[in-house]
Amino acid sequence: MTLDKWLFDKKDQIALLEQWRTCAQYGMTTKDFCQKLADSGSSSSKKIGQAGLKAPGQGKAFTEVLEGWLSPVVLSTLVIAEKNGQLQQGLDLAIKELGGGQGVMKALFWMMALPMATLFGLGVLGVYISGEIITTADLAGSMASQVRELVKGPGLMVLCTLTGTFALSAFSMPIWTGQSRALVDKLWPFCDYRTAVAGNLLSTLANLSQAGMSLKAAMKEVQPHSSRYLTAHLQRMLSHLETETNPGRALDTGLLLADAQTNLNVMGDIAPLTTLLEKSAEQHHRHLAKKMATLQLIVPKVILVLAILLLGALVGSAMASLFISIQL
């Protein structure tokens, strides 16, 4: 993969597909679209447009030119839709696919970054202020000194342990599989990661299904581009499909929310596959959005309160010890 393709991120991909969709809506051919890109696009878009103009002479379709520029699953959606004569619908689905996805760990990181930095900053400030008071007033061995040493020693160790545990959890989530993972998947933040993965998978399968893929083919398309964690679930789902015709029971690997899984099991033999997958994906996304909103409301405030209490304990104990020493 070239550097240009590697730097062509999700926003660039969406912008490209939206341009293509607009051109298609105005009745422009793919050749016209490629010419437009070659004449007035960004440097990356110009390369795509120029390659697209050369593609027919090389016996290629334009979608083949997009290999490496678009994510594999999105490209598969376009290829299948184009084969079925539904390119515009395929573009809609591809844009929808790129616009999906919920980075749980990223969201949690940004949710906690500022409060944790504030906690650390106020802790350092409190240690410094109390240290200056202790040194100036010769309060060694006092209550203030003991509180300061507690924060500097065990307190700092606890903070580092919590930070390390969170970092280790983030690292292990995409790769940890097996029975032990099934147990921790019920605990936070693993349960939120599982819900996000399930919602994104269901959305992708729904998009591929709407483009014309069977459930089995869609899973096989997604599998090579999945994390080790999701791959393990997909392998079990594909195994279930060997003997199971009900999509709900085929998807029953412990990945989905219990309520959503029950709905899929009941409706699997009745509802259209695409509708079934879309509704289940929406259920997972709603559940996660509600959970994240609750965490956003509570967690930062709790951390900030702890930071204020920590600063108050350090400075307050120093002032109290100073007052006692003056009285004596």
What are the functions of these language-model segments?
Residues 6, 60-64, 149-156, 160, ...:
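N-proximal short alpha-helices
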